[in-house]
């Protein structure tokens, strides 16, 4: 199963690697393959000072954890996503959050589900007919099998 991972999921795993989200990302087997646009790395880097404030980890521990999480994600260059797909994703995310365009575009391009904790994004996308989501609970069940 292929899953596109949104930044808020990785952010949550960094803040608490022992959480269910952290455990799913860090200890997933070959059943689930995680993908993300390279933009995720930029977003995490942009929030590194916030991460430092919210965790009890020192710099080397934070970067070690980020490296472990990144090792579990297949990063795809945004340049590989067709322009038509980007246009569709742009329309779907209008009025919500421009930063989510690449994640939606990648999910469309790979024909897979999006794992996000952004309820507003999910609601808005569902209203526009996008229903390719997977929940943390569903991923936990898949991992159990």
Q: Where are the regions that the model predicts?
A:
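Short, well-structured N-terminal submotif of metal-dependent ribonuclease cores
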Residues: 1-36
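Residue-level signal for well-ordered alpha-helical positions
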Residues: 17, 47, 127-128
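Short gly/ser/thr-rich secondary-structure transition/capping motifs
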Residues: 16-17, 57-59, 97
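PIN-domain endoribonuclease scaffold, especially VapC-family toxins
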Residues: 28-30, 35-87
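Short amphipathic alpha-helical segments and helix-helix/interface helices
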Residues: 22-25, 63-66, 103-104, 122
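Acidic, PIN/NYN-like endoribonuclease modules and their adjacent C-terminal/linker elements
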Residues: 36-37, 108-109, 113, 117-145
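Alpha-helix capping/helix-boundary segments
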Residues: 9-10, 40, 103, 120-121
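Active-site neighborhoods of divalent-metal-dependent phosphate/nucleic-acid chemistry enzymes
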Residues: 75-119
